[in-house]
Structure formats: C-alpha cells, structure tokens
Amino acid sequence: MGREIITLQAGQCGNQIGSQFWQQLCLEHGIGPDGTLESFATEGVDRKDVFFYQSDDTRYIPRAILIDLEPRVVNNILSDTYGSLYNPENILITKNGGGAGNNWANGYSHAERIFEDIMDMIDREADGSDSLEGFSLLHSIAGGTGSGLGSFLLERLNDRYPKKIIQTYSVFPNSQSVSDVVVQPYNSLLALKRLTLNADSVVVLDNAALAHIAADRLHTQNPTFHQQNQLVSTVMSASTTTLRYPGYMNNDLVSIIASLIPSPRCHFLLTSYTPFTNQQVEEAKAIRKTTVLDVMRRLLLPKNQMVSVNPSKKSCFISILDIIQGEADPADVHKSLLRIRERRYASFIPWGPASIQVALSKKSPYIKTNHRVSGLMLANHTSIASLFKRTLDQYDRLRKRNAFLEQYKKEAIFEDDLNEFDSSRDVVADLINEYEACEDPNYLSL
C-alpha cells in the first residue's frame, strides 16, 4: 500500500526542478505527457500512487502543488509538452505577479496573504490520500519566493501536520562566484533557520557543485541551468526509487530518514550519483563498465558530490545510505562493503558504527540505459557545516555595514526590530556547533 507524498514547488527554481522531476517520473513509469498510461507500460511492479493519483478518466495526475509569485516559469511549464499533466486546481500564481523581488521578507509576507488558498490546496490533496506519509518541498534558498514563501510553508506545515514527514530538496546558492542577488546571504540565513527547525530532512544541492559536475560530464565551460536541473531531477528520482519500486527495506520515507539521521538537528544530507548517462544528461562521458564496487567507490569521491564543502581533518560521515539500481547481486554488495572498510575509503564518527547501508532497487523497465548498475549516495557528513559557515560569514559582512536592510524593514516581520535576523543567526550558529560536536568521541555524553 502506497504511503503518499505531496510535492510542493515554490518559486522559479522549485518549479523548474519540479517540472523535470515529473518528466523523469513519467518516463520511468510509462506515463505519457498528458497522464495516460502508455500501451507498453504493463509491468505492474511499480507503485505509481506514491506520487500520482488517478483521475476519473484514469489519467495519472501528480500529487503536486505549483506556487509562484510571478507567472513566467509556471506559464512556461503549462505551455510545454507536459503542461496538461498537472491538476489546474493545484496551481497558484499571484494575480499581479510581481514576484518577491529576491527578498525573503517580501516572499514571507506574500505567503501570509495567500495562506488560505495554499492551505486549501494542501488540505484537499491530503484528504485525497489514503495514507499520507509527508511532504516534499522543492525550492532554492537564495531568492525571495523559494526562501521566504518556502519558510512560511515549512512553519505552517509543521503546525498543521505535526506527525507528517517534511523533506526538502533545497538548492543553495553558488557562494564561490559573484551573485546577481546581493541580499542572498540574508535570504539564505533566514531560510536556514526554518530548514533547521521545521524540516525532518533536507537534501542539500548546491549550484557551485552542480555547475562543476555538469561542466565536467558535458565538457562545457558554462553549463545551462536546464542541464544542472537535469542532474537534480536524476538525484530526486533515484532517491525515491525504493518508494516507487519497493523492496524489503527503505520502502517508505521514515525508514530512509531513520537510517540517516541519528540526531534530529543534524538532518542535512549531501548526495552523490554515478554514472550520469547520455539519456539523463546528453553527451555525458560514458563509463565503460559498472560494477557494484566501482559504483560504491565512485560515490565516495568528493568530485561526485552535489555539494561543495571544505572538509577539515576531523570531518567524517555520520551515516551513509547507498541506493543501487540495476543488476546488483547481494553477494557483490557484501564484498564491496568489506573492501571499502578494509581500504578506509570513508571515515566515520568516532562514537557510532561505521555503517554504510545499502538498498537494492529495481530499474525502470521502460528506460534503456547503457550501464548495468547506477548508484545514489545519501550521506550525513559533518563537513556540511562548512556550507553554513560560508553563509554565516557572508551574512556577518553585510550585517556589519547594515547593508540593504531598508527593503526588509518595509515588511511587517521586520517593522519594529531586526530580531528575526539575530534569532536566525543563533539557530545557524548552533547548527554548526552541533555538527562540530559530532566529530568528538564524547558526543553522546556532551
């Protein structure tokens, strides 16, 4: 029986990666662009109902809600090949459509004004589920809508559905290059507070690493956002394969999260994927032979990680879950795990087991790939704190000069004082300390 997941897409980035995610799922499940099941899709071993429901005319419709404060991106999606896939009642674009002006406070205030409409959609989707497991939020934390409206959604979902899991796929800005959004550190910090306090699990995707991986695989200096989003949709579909092609383990969100997050604060996950194939990213470099060991070893290489972190000497894994798709023999997996342990490819926390968990999953029978095995690693690693430190440093530099604060003071949340900034900074500083404490052998007795 499917445990359903409702996907919430907020802002430009959230809707763009969401659009490619749904295209990927349709291809994997043999669903046509208008939601009808293709005539060849007769295998019947998959659970489509986790992410789709069937309408009265038997079309498959995504359990998705598309929200944006300016219409361009959503209108592009609706006029595209897959435009008729979505339920039109689940699309919310604000009437005047001016966007949030890359301002967290603007996005947050906007969300308060349209809160009833958003909640009506969410409640309707939740009521239409037999056994709702949780929500998946797709957004970026640098702009206005994804960070501000996304933050508001996280808080309200937590209040309204306290027992449901909230997972996010959060795109972090490229902090290594000059941004076109000068207030990005403010937006990121304010959103990070909500990701820390109101989400159960955050899959961190970072534009710098995505651009680097796309450039490396495609031999191109400047990969487009479309190509980077394809990497994201590949990661998202791979991270949900065990839900859609269930096996004995990891066939619901709660079991995946339980194996990865031993202490609730440290719930920010990084991902690696290998190999990217021609179908997923055109003209990608082909890897000639894929064995289970080869895939598991490659997943541990920093260059395949979708987050650019600065590990210190003490940085270590808290936990790892490898999802291996394709023809994998459990005996090979066991041998590979022994080899990885012998060769010390990965260093783990000193106070817990050195556990790499492996979930074997089927591949979609409808997509032909030129390799036997592919793998996704979801990992909890203490070096993720370096990403938060970067955000904090950039925030401190802006805040010291009180730069660009006037835009924020126009909104109700900052009208009287700037306490919200200070409390967000405290939460993120505590989060960094928590990850650093994990590197201490005495963590459990601290």
From Swiss-Prot:
Q: Which GO terms describe its cellular component?
A: cytoplasm; equatorial microtubule organizing center; gamma-tubulin ring complex; gamma-tubulin small complex; half bridge of mitotic spindle pole body; inner plaque of mitotic spindle pole body; interphase microtubule organizing center; mating projection tip
GO terms (BP aspect): cytoplasmic microtubule organization; meiotic spindle organization; microtubule nucleation; mitotic cell cycle; mitotic cytokinesis, division site positioning; mitotic sister chromatid segregation; mitotic spindle midzone assembly; mitotic spindle organization
Q: Keywords in UniProt for this one?
A: Cytoplasm, Cytoskeleton, GTP-binding, Microtubule, Nucleotide-binding
Identify the InterPro entries for this entry.
Gamma_tubulin, Tub_FtsZ_C, Tubulin, Tubulin/FtsZ-like_C, Tubulin/FtsZ_2-layer-sand-dom, Tubulin/FtsZ_GTPase_sf, Tubulin_C, Tubulin_CS
Quick one: which residues bind GTP? 142-148
Q: Which GO terms describe its molecular function?
A: GTP binding; microtubule nucleator activity
The record ties this protein, via PROSITE patterns, to: TUBULIN
From the Swiss-Prot or TrEMBL record, state where the protein is found: Cytoplasm, Cytoskeleton, Microtubule organizing center, Spindle pole body
Tell me which SMART domains the record gives. Tubulin, Tubulin_C
Which Pfam families does the annotation name?
A: Tubulin, Tubulin_C
Going by the entry's taxonomy, the superkingdom of the source organism is recorded as: Eukaryota
- Note the PANTHER family from the entry: TUBULIN
Of which family is this protein a member? Answer: Belongs to the tubulin family.
**Role:** Tubulin is the major constituent of microtubules. The gamma chain is found at microtubule organizing centers (MTOC) such as the spindle poles or the centrosome, suggesting that it is involved in the minus-end nucleation of microtubule assembly.
Binding partners and assembly: Interacts with mto1. Interacts with mto2.
Q: What is this protein called?
A: Tubulin gamma chain
